[in-house]
A protein has these predicted regions:
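Active-site beta-loop-alpha junctions enriched in small/polar residues
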Residues: 42-45, 65-67, 92-94
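Short beta-alpha connecting loops at secondary-structure transitions
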Residues: 88-94, 112-123, 175
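Divalent metal-coordination and catalytic microenvironments
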Residues: 39, 53, 60, 92, ...
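Short acidic/histidine-rich active-site segments
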Residues: 70-73, 80-104, 151-157
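Alpha-helix capping/termination and helix-coil
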Residues: 31, 81-87, 110-117, 131-143
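C-terminal cap of metal-dependent C-N hydrolases
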Residues: 156-184
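Mid-to-C-terminal alpha-helical segments outside catalytic/metal-binding sites
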Residues: 126, 133-137, 141-145, 153-159, ...
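Histidine/acidic residue-rich metal-binding segments in metalloenzymes
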Residues: 1-59, 71-87, 146
Length: 184
């Protein structure tokens, strides 16, 4: 259980007796962080770790349903958004997630961000951007002739249709983010 909760006694004891730096600081000292690297899950990132990821242009792929299955805490999605970190949305795999429906993870991230105090009205748009361009960026596929994750002249047409009622642009984006799961 020592790796499952930042607040467990074994985790805090290990951190207090560690080498004086986080795993993010450690891999940064090795020169690993950068735009050609992404962090999976990003659950136990403190403010300094998040700042370091921003400084190195390293994206974080958030997989909140997988975190629940394997017993991890929720990612600090509200902090990532408020502080301007590059995020992507992931499902992990069927070995640790009930399905590969990316929009289920988007909906959960929406609820988590709100519960963590992120109140900006851009939440749905930013999470859908994380699920599209954010994912392409994290995988190094957002630039070049075969770029993905964006509707743009010259980009690869990699699209899906989500069956939701179309109202205003803002309301439709909100509906896709919060209720689009299972409607692709």
């Amino acid at each position: 259980d020592l790796w499952k909760s930042e607040h467990s006694s074994s985790f805090t004891a290990m951190r207090s007796r560690g080498g004086g730096f986080s795993s993010t600081q450690f891999v940064d000292q090795l020169g690993v962080l950068g735009p050609d690297c992404h962090v999976a899950h990003g659950v136990y990132m403190r403010a300094d770790d998040r700042r370091r990821l921003r400084a190195r242009q390293t994206a974080v792929a958030l997989c909140p349903r997988s975190n629940r299955v394997i017993g991890l805490d929720a990612p600090p999605v509200g902090a990532y958004l408020a502080e301007g970190n590059m995020i992507a949305v992931g499902t992990d795999s069927l070995s640790s997630s009930p399905s590969l429906d990316l929009l289920e993870d988007v909906a959960l991230l929406f609820d988590l961000a709100r519960s963590q105090g992120y109140e900006d009205q851009d939440l749905a748009r930013r999470l859908l951007q994380a699920a599209t361009l954010g994912g392409a960026t994290a995988m190094g596929l957002a630039t070049g002739p075969d770029r993905l994750g964006q509707l743009q002249s010259g980009a690869v047409a990699d699209m899906c249709v989500v069956d939701v009622p179309v109202t205003s642009i803002v309301e439709t984006i909100d509906t896709v983010a919060r209720h689009g799961a299972g409607r692709v």
